[in-house]
Amino acid sequence: MKKALQVAMFSLFTVIGFNAQANEHHHETMSEAQPQVISATGVVKGFDLESKKITIHHDPIAAVNWPEMTMRFTITPQTKMSGIKTGDKVAFNFVQQGNLSLLQDIKVSQ
């Protein structure tokens, strides 16, 4: 009886171990879905650096079915921006994450 219990326990732990290894292996091959980078143009209306926001009146954005409007975009540590000021006509890229529009980069356009 003791031997049968040992065999059963060994079998159980062997199956659990192989299952854990199989799950770990599959996680290595899975890739996370990359967020869609959306391009747009508009005019800078203001900055709120304390809240890390920039307000832009943007042209219609077909990729997300948005009409022309004024809205705030979130400035992230990865946002590439320099020399942008209120009133500048800009081209910018952002990623939509839930209700947040995360600004990726922005530059003055002609």
Swiss-Prot record:
Signal peptide range: 1-21
CC per GO annotation: periplasmic space
Compartments where found: Periplasm
Induction notes from the record: Transcriptionally regulated by CusR in response to copper and silver ions.
Quaternary structure (record): The cus efflux system is composed of CusA, CusB, CusC and CusF.
Function field: Part of a cation efflux system that mediates resistance to copper and silver. Binds one copper per polypeptide.
Protein's UniProt name: Cation efflux system protein CusF
